[in-house]
Amino acid sequence: MQLSDFSFELPDELIARYPLETRSASRLLHLDAKGQYHDHMFTDIIDLFEEGDLLVLNDTKVMKARLKGKRATGGAIEILVERMLNHTTAYCHIKASNSPKAGAELFVGADNIPVIVRGRHENLFVVEFSQPILPVLEQYGQLPIPPYFNREAEEIDTERYQTVFHNPEKIASVAAPTASLHFDEELLAKLDQKGVKKTFVTLHVGAGTFMPVRTDDITNHVMHSEWCDVPQETIDLILATKARGNKVIAVGTTATRALESAAQAHGGKIAAWTGDTQIFIYPGYEFCIVDRLITNFHLPESTLLMLVSALSNRENILAAYEHAVKDRYRFFSYGDAMLIDKLEV
């Protein structure tokens, strides 16, 4: 399967660089189990879900992971904290005119807080902060909004690039689980009133989510690693949902990857799991848990487009995307949503 099989033309003006005034005011394109698409508003999910269905949401929180700084010589640098190893050490991306070497001292924030480059881990730098990382990020960091916004993070992003249900204790992502950004408290309450249940997994989203696929044959692509947790409480609800004939609805590709990683770790069995995942889902993958997926519109030739193509199929997804472009849906993180049903075979 070739990378070019997942290409499509997207006019630049359809990239949503700011959120709508109301979270749940976005549009929804439903791709059903027969491969037919239907136009809706996002709030229509109340009518598209059944009593007893289960929403699975990712409760991670986005860090203000981007830090501006400088070298001892004064040259500008930028640090993106990818993963904290302990309260003062992290794997980081560093942008600089020349790659810093082990032992280099850098300074971040307006108060020039010292950090030391301790070495490398694969394509990342091991960076030791002279103070606890999270307070430094909270005071001096910026939310790492996606590169295709072509702008710096603004005040509106502080609220709108976080989900309303994030767990403050789980602050470790460098990108939002964006399908969840469509849910506000009012919509969640209405779903609850209908009898749609909800549960949580955690997947801390890494910067690798924005990395392009660089191999022509997609099966040669190596996925980035992300930490996830699928607790027993969530598994119990999934098993009960399936036992009564209801649907498990993953909210976002991150929730999907967490759930399917747990199943793959147990040979396809639905069971709890915590660990690092590099799962790469593309057409031909057999889903073990996910019946339906709420997701945003994804970049051409991205691993996320490949994932959604595995749930329906590539032809149906690209036809739906072509319709979305013609009908001027808004794309990417602050854009509109899709509801994709597992294709009937």
Curated annotation (Swiss-Prot):
Its main location: cytoplasm. Its EC number is 2.4.99.17. GO terms for molecular function: S-adenosylmethionine:tRNA ribosyltransferase-isomerase activity. Pathway: tRNA modification; tRNA-queuosine biosynthesis. It is an enzyme of class 2 (transferase). It catalyses: 7-aminomethyl-7-carbaguanosine(34) in tRNA + S-adenosyl-L-methionine = epoxyqueuosine(34) in tRNA + adenine + L-methionine + 2 H(+). Keywords: Cytoplasm, Queuosine biosynthesis, S-adenosyl-L-methionine, Transferase. Monomer. This is S-adenosylmethionine:tRNA ribosyltransferase-isomerase. The gene is queA.
